[in-house]
Regions:
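Interfacial loop-to-transmembrane junctions
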Residues: 450-478
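Juxtamembrane boundary at the C-terminal end of a transmembrane helix
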Residues: 484-518
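Membrane-helix interface motif
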Residues: 32-40, 118-125, 302-320, 395-410, ...
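N-terminal secretory/membrane targeting signals
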Residues: 1-37
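Long, well-ordered mid-to-C-terminal structural blocks that present hydrophobic/aromatic surfaces
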Residues: 310-403
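Hydrophobic alpha-helical transmembrane segments and adjacent short intramembrane/lumenal linkers
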Residues: 379-387, 391-444, 450-454, 462
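Final/C-terminal transmembrane alpha-helix of multipass membrane proteins
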Residues: 387, 468-492
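Transmembrane-helix bundle segments that line or gate the permeation/cavity pathway
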Residues: 23, 34-275, 289, 303-307, ...
Length: 518
């Protein structure tokens, strides 16, 4: 990736500001692919060896299980299934105004979508000078995911494909087409939500494996192809069937929104305020595809961190030695195998935990399959925590690029809003803060998952002792995942070992390894 040119040649800059801007661009230009969203430009010297942090975090997660088992002996009746948990807040006389505001937001979102397509097609070929890569990979995919998880699911309002489909469908009905533009084909029941799982893995492949994911031309092609697939699916099967089974973004943001403290009341007349994660305890019993989808949410973000560290180098080398015919300069084969392989490993690990739980319960609770279907939603907080840990620094630093890019979306030296000369503040967050935010996010996500699993077990089994017994294997799995995820997130951020030993630590785990302060 070449150094981008100056954004504006009409304004004179002081030598200091120009040097600072070029330094920022030089640093960002050295980051390949979609590492733009989660890079770390300095390392933090830990005050204690990393294994102490890992062991402490794992101990906190294990202790949360003990606390949940001992202190959550509440009446089972209070955990009965209800349409919504939480406190409802009515909108009052505002629905008309809200509908008008929602229509305006949907129109603006659709207009921004067209702007992204246009900038990707006709704008600068430099990803740092083009609005499309930053808006899609950083602001939307990373930023909106965290917003939805922390606040509520706003994606149905922002979804440009849904807005475009609804607009064309409404126009067709006004023109006398009774059925609108929907063909009314039946979505194959045998497929279930597996198309969404496949598309999530494909999207992750584009983000993590494909080396030109930030190239504006490739972004335009991917966006147009994705638009064609989504709109064709809704036309053939209807928007509800497509979004329920194949619209990966609708499903992804819906799952994250279940973790959020705010939700729309089922009647649409108000909001529901609830504890974070409460919405996951009232999710429907899942199918095999739902399990695969949630596991993909976990495995893909961990693969992102793993592939960005030193431990991935030996993996690629071993892959090339074992299968030389599949080796390639861009590491497509190794990256694809790693992405799918880690997903399969997580599936097997989760299934093994469910089999163990069924064994402890003596075949009750529907066996391993029933446990797997009911408890998979409790893993979502782990995905939220790791997503925050992995992308916190990148979102704060790289996300600032959208401010000047909105004034010059095509890289044509415009300054529409007077922000084209706003330079990213790379010192907005340091490695120390990033590290402790990462530790807190990972631990909080796993503790929340343990607590939710115990809530679901207590609701289903209606006996505190058996509920605790059912959660033991899942807690062991979560403790192990805490150690692995914290080790992976630490590798590019902190200095805890000499370089060769650091790679060995990441590749082979922490068992039996004693490190110094490095």
């Amino acid at each position: 990736m070449t150094l981008p040119r100056s954004r504006s040649q009409s304004r004179r800059r002081s030598p200091l500001r120009q040097t600072s801007w070029l330094a920022v661009l030089s640093m960002l230009a050295a980051i390949p692919g979609t590492a733009l969203a989660h890079s770390f430009d300095e390392r933090y010297d830990l005050p204690a060896p990393l294994p102490y942090f890992v062991a402490g975090a794992a101990a906190v997660v294990a202790l949360s299980f003990v606390i949940a088992a001992v202190f959550s002996r509440r009446k089972v009746g209070s955990l009965e299934r209800r349409p919504q948990h939480g406190r409802a807040i009515a909108f009052g006389p505002l629905p008309v105004l809200l509908r008008g505001g929602i229509l305006l937001v949907r129109a603006l979102s659709l207009g921004l979508f067209f702007l992204v397509i246009a900038s990707a097609l006709f704008g600068s070929g430099d990803p740092l000078m083009n609005l499309a890569p930053t808006l899609i990979w950083i602001v939307w995919w990373v930023g909106l995911s965290l917003l939805v998880a922390c606040v509520g699911n706003v994606w149905p309002v922002l979804d440009p494909w849904l807005t475009l489909f609804d607009a064309v469908d409404a126009l067709a009905r006004c023109m006398g087409w009774r059925g609108g533009i929907v063909l009314g084909l039946a979505f194959p029941r045998a497929l279930g939500a597996w198309p969404a799982v496949a598309l999530l893995l494909l999207w992750s492949w584009l983000e993590l494996v494909f080396p030109l994911a930030t190239a504006p031309g490739r972004v335009a092609f991917a966006a147009l192809a994705w638009s064609a697939l989504t709109l064709a699916g809704m036309v053939c099967f209807g928007r509800a069937a497509w979004q329920r089974n194949a619209d990966v973004f609708a499903l992804y943001f819906d799952v994250l929104g279940r973790f959020a403290p705010l939700a729309l009341h089922p009647g649409g007349r108000g909001l529901v305020v609830r504890a974070p994660g409460e919405g996951l305890t009232v999710m429907r019993d899942s199918g095999a595809a739902d399990i695969g989808f949630v596991i993909a949410m976990l495995s893909t973000v961990l693969f992102d961190g793993l592939r960005g560290g030193q431990a991935w180098g030996p993996v690629e080398a071993a892959f090339a030695r074992s299968l030389p015919a599949l080796a390639d300069t861009n590491a497509y084969a190794a990256g694809t195998a790693g992405l799918v392989g880690l997903w399969l490993v997580f599936l097997v690990a989760y299934w093994a935990a469910c089999v163990a739980a069924a064994g402890l319960l003596g075949g009750a609770a529907g066996g391993a399959g029933g446990i797997a279907r009911r408890y998979v939603w409790t893993l979502v907080p782990i995905a939220v925590g790791y997503n925050l840990a992995h992308n916190f620094s990148g979102l704060l630093v790289q996300g600032q690029n959208v401010i000047p890019l909105l004034s010059d979306p095509f890289g044509w030296h415009w300054d529409l809003f007077g922000t084209a000369q706003r330079y990213p503040d790379i010192g907005i967050v340091d490695a120390r803060t990033t590290w402790y935010v990462a530790v807190a996010a990972i631990v909080a996500g796993h503790v929340s998952a343990v607590w939710l699993a115990h809530r679901v077990a207590l609701r289903d089994l209606r006996e505190p002792r058996r509920a605790a017994l059912a959660c033991v294997p899942l807690t062991v799995l979560m403790v192990a995942y805490t150690a692995v995820s914290l080790s992976v997130i630490a590798e590019p951020m902190v200095r805890f070992l000499p370089e060769p030993a650091q790679a060995a630590f990441m590749a082979f785990g922490i068992a039996g390894f004693k490190s110094g302060d490095g």
